[in-house]
């Protein structure tokens, strides 16, 4: 059981592109908390400004999370209510923050999720592939680690479909590795989801190349 004298960590989902894709509850929480910890305060400032929200904000990301976590835990124990957000989508899903959530569980600090958009589930929903079972890689590794992972996927009979994030700069090399290891399979690619220039591709790897 959580200690009722402690504060609350709110894990808040934010838009993945279109700023209007945010829940009323998320806005209520962001307006009510004592502090917002953000992956990139500049990007989160843009969202808060759009909705007229002014709150103290600090960075909390891969570079500084392990240094800051003890201080954040102490403030939560003092009764503060803190919202954790990422640059886009749900925190922790291929984003920083899992270590803070774990510490809160260990320290009996209440954690509440405020669900929101996810690039992963949004892409799967419009992919044309079944969404009942798939393997999520996260961000695809680079070079030989990528090829090693693809070979493991090929050898695993339980994995029929998989999803991953990739940067535009590395996409071509990743597709070439998929073609060489998994063959000319059907794929779906989405970019700029919910934004003005949203694009999709459905077809084979060779067609994408």
Question: Each predicted region: which residue ranges?
Answer:
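Short glycine-rich anion-binding loops that position phosphate/pyrophosphate groups of nucleotides
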Residues: 16-17, 87-91, 168-170, 193
């Amino acid at each position: 059981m959580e200690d009722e004298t402690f504060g609350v960590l709110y894990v808040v989902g934010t838009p993945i592109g279109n700023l209007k894709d945010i829940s009323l509850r998320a806005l209520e929480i962001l307006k009510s908390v004592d502090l917002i910890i953000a992956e990139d305060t500049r990007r989160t400032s843009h969202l808060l400004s759009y909705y007229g929200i002014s709150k103290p904000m600090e960075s909390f990301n891969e570079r500084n999370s392990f240094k800051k976590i003890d201080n954040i835990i102490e403030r939560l124990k003092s009764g503060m209510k803190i919202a954790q957000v990422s640059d886009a989508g749900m925190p922790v899903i291929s984003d920083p923050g899992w270590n803070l959530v774990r510490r809160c569980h260990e320290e009996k600090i209440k954690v509440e999720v405020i669900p929101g958009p996810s690039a992963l589930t949004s892409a799967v929903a419009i992919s044309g592939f079944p969404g009942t079972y798939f393997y999520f890689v996260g961000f695809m590794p680079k070079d030989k680690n990528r090829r090693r992972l693809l070979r493991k996927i090929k050898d695993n009979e339980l994995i029929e479909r998989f999803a991953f994030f990739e940067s535009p700069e590395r996409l071509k090399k990743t597709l070439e590795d998929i073609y060489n290891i998994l063959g000319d399979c059907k794929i779906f690619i989405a970019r700029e989801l919910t934004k003005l220039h949203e694009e999709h591709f459905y077809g084979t790897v060779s067609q994408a190349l």
